[in-house]
Amino acid sequence: MTATPLYRQDTIAAIATPPGRGGVGIIRLSGPASRDLAERILGHCPAPRHAHYGPFYDADAQVLDEGIALFFPGPHSFTGEDVLELQGHGGPVIMDLLLARCVALGARLARPGEFSERAFLNDKLDLAQAEAIADLIDASSRAAAENALRSLQGEFSTRVSALVDKLIELRMFVEAAIDFPEEEIDFLADGKVAAMLQGAQETLGEVRAAAGQGALMREGMNVVIAGRPNAGKSSLLNALTERDSAIVTDIEGTTRDVLREYIHIDGMPLHVIDTAGLRDTPDAIEKIGVARAWEEIEKADRVLLLVDATTTTQTDPMQLWPEFVARLPHPERLTLVRNKIDESGETEQSDLSTSPPIVRLSAKTGLGVDNLKEHLKAVMGFDATTEGRFSARRRHLDALDRAGDALDNGIAQLRGHGAGELLAEDLRDAQQALSEITGEFTADDLLGEIFGSFCIGK
């Protein structure tokens, strides 16, 4: 990348505040004509980084509005270019007139996310930080906002960059052993590279775990309530959402489709999904509901297998329902929930150290529901203090997984054959995968997809 702005010919403009009426509306401009536009609209260019109050003029020198103007000369601005902000009254008509005035003077309308894209291309922030801006805007809880802010401040990027530096150092030793085989010290044979590779793999695992939690905090964990008809699945959904989200009756097969609710538990986002009772049925509509239930179960982050505690004392899912367990793609994501303990006489004591964990509750009375909430927080890795965490996306997890696979291959090569050339290739693959996170190696179409999801004016 270059330290000088890449966009030298055009200046972009956009309304940076949300649509509708408001006390203040902001027009943002970035590009080489920003200073000239300031002089044409304000009559002069404000002193850099000083707020100036005054009128905004149209082409006939008539006052369109009055407000505050701020000028940030590049490269010391958000985008790295000359930036002008016009803060006027937040009515749609005023904002449209001001924006039209900017366009008439030569600015063009910005694409969604183009300001952040220019900041990225001009080395003002990396790709993970740019994505964190959108995550901060979209945050649905305080914890998610705090994670996004840490990513914006560089927490995620710093950890990824440290990993890349380790891989570069590893490549130096490996390629030295390949290029200079006559040297007395063989880094591949003396264990130094193996130790460094193992350390890099462990560090990558730590970053991957933190990123996984960050992605869950950003996107929310998918929790699917599954079980036979009349086990109390809809009642549990209502208990978790604390409202009548689903119809509850004693008639089997009342729920025939997937019901989704988005909730927070102490700031932790959850997508709770109620499903049709699982059974063989001749009813064509109910069959569709059962098929959809299995679709949700198979992609869930957590499956709550709800059992009517009045019908069985069994707590082993393999004994209760071996066909269900056998079909699960991730049995380790299962929690057994024994419902209706108000009728069975069981206590609300949970057995969370068993496999799978067991939670006892009454969805009808609410007894034990708080224990289930705490269990969900625990399996998600959520706690009140989110220090050291950061926001992450699915594409970041994919890149980390590919880097991990490459390191695994490298370790196998080293242990099996000591093949330096193959190890060097694996290290390059891992480095490139990690560099995609910060944007050092990123395809143009991916950049377009990422920044295209931003707000206009960001």
Curated annotation (Swiss-Prot):
It comes from Chromohalobacter salexigens (strain ATCC BAA-138 / DSM 3043 / CIP 106854 / NCIMB 13768 / 1H11). This is tRNA modification GTPase MnmE. GO terms for cellular component: cytosol. Transmembrane segments: none annotated. Its EC number is 3.6.-.-. The gene is mnmE. It holds the Pfam family MnmE_helical. Keywords: Cytoplasm, GTP-binding, Hydrolase, Magnesium, Metal-binding, Nucleotide-binding, Potassium, tRNA processing. (6S)-5-formyl-5,6,7,8-tetrahydrofolate binds at residues 28, 85, 124, 458. Residues 220-381 form the TrmE-type G domain.
